């Protein structure tokens, strides 16, 4: 039998102020967080904490 997929997946977070320039990768549990994730992380381009949103 095939093993079922795990709940954890790798997602990419992209800065909203500098789109397409700076990204982070992290993991999330798709059962607990089915919606797109948003985190405040440090953006070295703007040199401050910005909102990073999950991209597909």
From Swiss-Prot:
Coiled-coil features, chain-numbered ranges: none
GO BP terms in the entry: translation
Record's keyword terms, sorted: Chloroplast, Plastid, Ribonucleoprotein, Ribosomal protein
The organism's place on the tree of life at top rank: Eukaryota
Compartment list: Plastid, Chloroplast
GO CC annotation terms, alphabetical: chloroplast; ribonucleoprotein complex; ribosome
GO molecular function: structural constituent of ribosome
Similarity comment: family membership: Belongs to the bacterial ribosomal protein bL33 family.
HAMAP family: Ribosomal_bL33 (MF_00294)
Name under which the protein is recorded: Large ribosomal subunit protein bL33c
């Amino acid at each position: 039998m095939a093993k079922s997929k795990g709940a954890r997946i790798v997602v990419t977070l992209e800065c909203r102020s500098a789109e397409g320039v700076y990204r982070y990768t992290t993991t999330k549990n798709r059962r607990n967080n089915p919606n797109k994730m948003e985190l405040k992380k440090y953006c070295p381009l703007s040199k401050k904490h910005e909102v990073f949103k999950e991209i597909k």
